[in-house]
Amino acid sequence: KEQNGRPFFAWSVDLNGHFDIYDEPPGSLQFLPLFDFCSPTDEIYRNTVAMIRSPEYKYSFANSPINEIGCPHAPHPWILSLANSLLCGRVEHCRAILEKISMDNGIACESVDEVTGYCTTGEAFATCAGFLCHSIREALL
């Protein structure tokens, strides 16, 4: 699709041409290069990431201290989004956030408050903790 003269990957498109600009932390569009769908330098990909991280996107939390992506299910920054960012090369951004957040007493949770970093949903989210550990390891290798 295209918006404001900039092509982007839509989350979904219907037969009438309606589309959604959206991202879901458990299955992020940021992973498209990791699945060899496109290059991380691809203009369409970069436009897409810019759109889902912009202050105009409802779940970006771009102007918050914990500026990661959320979704309607848990409308706060997700730890899975932080892990996604690590795997996509945003290591310093993530390091700064990890130093600020307490999550669920240091255990990964589903989402955190965008200002305080305290757990808002999904306490002791084991699969998220595993994915976060994997992402940290991959990002630091």
Where are these regions (language model features)?
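Extended ligand-binding clefts on enzyme/binding-domain cores
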Residues: K1-L80
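C-terminal capping/lid segments that line or modulate ligand- or cofactor-binding pockets
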Residues: F19-P40, P75-L141
